[in-house]
Amino acid sequence: MPSQFFGLNTAYKGLLASNAALNTTSNNISNVQTKGYSRQQVVQQASDALRVFQTYGCAGAGVDTIAIERVRNEFYDTKYWGANTNMGEYSIKQYYMQQLETYFSDDGKTTGFKTIFDQFSVTGLQAVLKAASDKTTKAQFIGYAGNLTEYFRSMVGNLEKVQKDANQELKLKVDEINSLAGEIASLNKQINVIELTGSKANELRDRRTVLLDQLSNIVDIQTQEIPITDANNPDRETGAYRFLVRIGGG
C-alpha cells in the first residue's frame, strides 16, 4: 500500500510539469519576434504506476517531464532551402541581366546598337552608294563608322566591368560561405556538449538553422545528422550527433 505522502508526491510532480509547460509558453511568447525561433513544447509521459496489490491493480504515480523540444519539421526545412537556393540563383542572374540590358538598351532614350548600326549600314552606306563622289556623304559615313567603333569600344569596357564585378562578388560569396561554415561548426560543438547530458540545445539549433537559411541562399546544400555511438558499444548512442552539410551536391 502506498504511503500517505504518495498522493502529495503525485500532485507535486503534476505541479512541476505544469510549471515547465507555463515557462515554455512564456518563452514562446517572448520570442514571437525572434528571427529563426522555433516554438517549443514540453514532452510529458505518465510515471510508472505503483503496484499496490489491490483489486484496482496499480496506482498512478503522476507525470514525468521528459524534455522540451522544438516544434519543427525537417522536411519543410529541406524544401525551403531548395527554394531559397533557386531564389538566390535567379536573383543574381536577374541583377546581371539587368546590367547587360542597360548596356544594350535602345529604347529611344538611349542610343543603342540597332540605331548606331542602322545609321552606319542603312543611312550612311546607302547614301555613299548613291553618291560616291559626294564628300559630305563620305564624311557622314565615316562619322557613322566612328560611332559604331566607339560603341563597340564602350561595350567592351562595360562588359569587362560586369565581369570584374561578378568576380569580386564571387570572392565575397566564397568568404561568406567560409564564415558561415565556421559558425555552423562552432555551434555543432556547443550543441553536442549540451546534448551529451541529455538536454536539448533548442536555441543553438535555431541559430544553426538561421545560418543554414543564409547559406542556402548562396549555394545548394544538403544536411545529414548522424548519431554518434559509443566506441566500446556500437549499439549505444551517446546523445551527440555528427552534423554534415554538403555544399553544391558534394
Q: PLM features: residue spans?
A:
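Conserved acidic
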Residues: 14, 112, 176, 200, ...
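Interfacial residues of coiled-coil/leucine-zipper alpha-helices
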Residues: 19, 184, 188, 208-209
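Bacterial Type III/flagellar export signals at protein N-termini
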Residues: 1-123, 127-141, 146, 153-154, ...
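An alpha-helix initiation/capping motif
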Residues: 118, 142, 178, 202-210
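Aromatic-residue-lined binding/catalytic grooves and analogous aromatic/hydrophobic interfacial grooves
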Residues: 194-201, 205-212, 217-218, 227
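Long, non-coiled-coil amphipathic alpha-helical linker/lever segments
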Residues: 145-192
